Amino acid sequence: MTARLSAISVYPVKSAAGIGVDRWPLDDFGLQFDRRWAVIDSTGVVLTQREYAGMSLVRTAIGDTGLRLEAPGMPQLQLPLADSGGSRLPVRIWSDSCEAARCAPEADEWWSALLGEWCHLVRMPDEALRKPGPDRVSFADAFSFLVLSEASLDALNSRLERPVPMNRFRPNLVVSGVAPHAEDEWAGIRIGSVELAITKACARCVMTTIDQATAARAVEPLRTLATYRRGPDGGVLFGQNARHLTRGTLSVGDAVVPEPRG
């Protein structure tokens, strides 16, 4: 069976819902517009579902008119895709920092009303040089891509009383036609003209326990994953982080050619 790219997801706002797309271009940061926006508190710290599970209920869409955000009980928010020239604010994400452009005041008000505390929506400028590793990244934790196979999720769901959907793990690229956890053995993959280097396994956190449709928290699937996916340092590993070596356009259905480790 040929390995193929079975799904592409873009997450414009960090920790908000993603967008499933059939075809999407890459830029210097990774998938175009992926995690180019983030919500920060009054001290500049990036907010995520880890603290605010309700961020999962924010639906995103990208079109000719810009970025659209919707959430239960909230008016629709429309924002331009381009940098609007807002003032720069310092942003802290994990152990590194950068500057980002403040979005419109109405965006701050929208998010503050949703989360119940004063916060700002910021956009990473095109010229930003956030480099938690060897490459520029947007507001992703550390790497531009998360790669996961359908078979890995199937293997997990076979152990769960209640199966979970793929969106619990928020991958960018989903691969079909491979064995469970085959991605653990890859040094890289080629998808059409795009080459990606597999960098390290993704250590999973409590965000996997948040139902992305309801924002309800539970103990699964992290509890079950911990019984068979512990890494050497104790982390619970599921999926692989990756960075792109070349640019191009990815399409669902593209053949995925793995490069084995070693």
Each model region followed by its residue ranges:
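Metal-cofactor-dependent catalytic cores
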Residues: 1-262
